């Protein structure tokens, strides 16, 4: 259980509550969650963040009416900057997008600008939005995370409670290595509903070699952990940086979609360009 799971800032969220679906534009449906909720317990404040990054959202169920009432469909790509005051709560995002369904917009650009304006206001930070026509995305292959997968290890695990203990003494030797490690076994749970969130994670670092068994045990320990996607990625970044002390570190997770949305947060303290192709489970 997260230390802030019952924080009053979460009381007003529609997440975990019965809600009515609206199909006419309603910006009031969007809800933000302060990033400080999980950053404060980690000792992170806006002026001392050890990383940069973004939350990348893919919007698969986006539709509206053109000026003549003809339905339009698109796939949206949203990038929410890590410096924003709030992250966007995903159920509220879904409800907000549903409110476009029977709303007329003159142009695609009007839709894009509306999304960008509303998301920036909710997040209190920088947000960029792109809309793709379906034929732009046809024929795109399923992507894969570059790196060495650490999942196929002959180990026994019987503890699924979150702990950083596995990262203690997880580095060895004085030689500096540079490697990219991948796991598809990341599973955490929604902070409010405790529904499972499934993801793949890519960890790229330069520093003393990290023990792969200990790293995998640490990642598996998220299995009963309740936090939002973005919060898990920041926790993983902070824990690896704290215990393993790499010179450079990038952490990037791509989660399976829910409600027509997938969330793909990344955090890095070096030059890092996230690949945005959807993975096999997305």
UniProtKB/Swiss-Prot annotation:
Q: Does the keyword NADP apply?
A: yes
Active-site residues (renumbered): 190 (thioimide intermediate), 197 (proton donor)
Question: Where does the chain bind NADPH?
Answer: 90-91, 258-259
GO MF term (any one): preQ1 synthase activity
Where is the protein localized?
Answer: Cytoplasm
Q: What Pfam family is a match for this entry?
A: QueF
E.C. designation(s): 1.7.1.13
What is catalysed by this protein? 7-aminomethyl-7-carbaguanine + 2 NADP(+) = 7-cyano-7-deazaguanine + 2 NADPH + 3 H(+)
Q: Which SUPFAM superfamilies match?
A: Tetrahydrobiopterin biosynthesis enzymes-like (SSF55620)
Is the keyword Translocase in the record? no
Q: What is one Gene Ontology biological process annotated in the Swiss-Prot or TrEMBL record?
A: tRNA modification
Q: Which residues bind substrate?
A: 88-90, 229-230
The pathway is: tRNA modification; tRNA-queuosine biosynthesis
Q: Name one GO cellular component term.
A: cytosol
The protein's UniProt keywords, in alphabetical order, are: Cytoplasm, NADP, Oxidoreductase, Queuosine biosynthesis
Outline what the protein does: Catalyzes the NADPH-dependent reduction of 7-cyano-7-deazaguanine (preQ0) to 7-aminomethyl-7-deazaguanine (preQ1).
**HAMAP family reported for this sequence:** QueF_type2
In the record, the note on similarity to other proteins reads:
Belongs to the GTP cyclohydrolase I family. QueF type 2 subfamily.
- NCBIfam families to which the protein is assigned, alphabetical: QueF
Assembly, in brief, is: Homodimer.
Per its record, how is this protein called by name?
NADPH-dependent 7-cyano-7-deazaguanine reductase
From the UniProt record, report the name of the gene that encodes this protein. queF
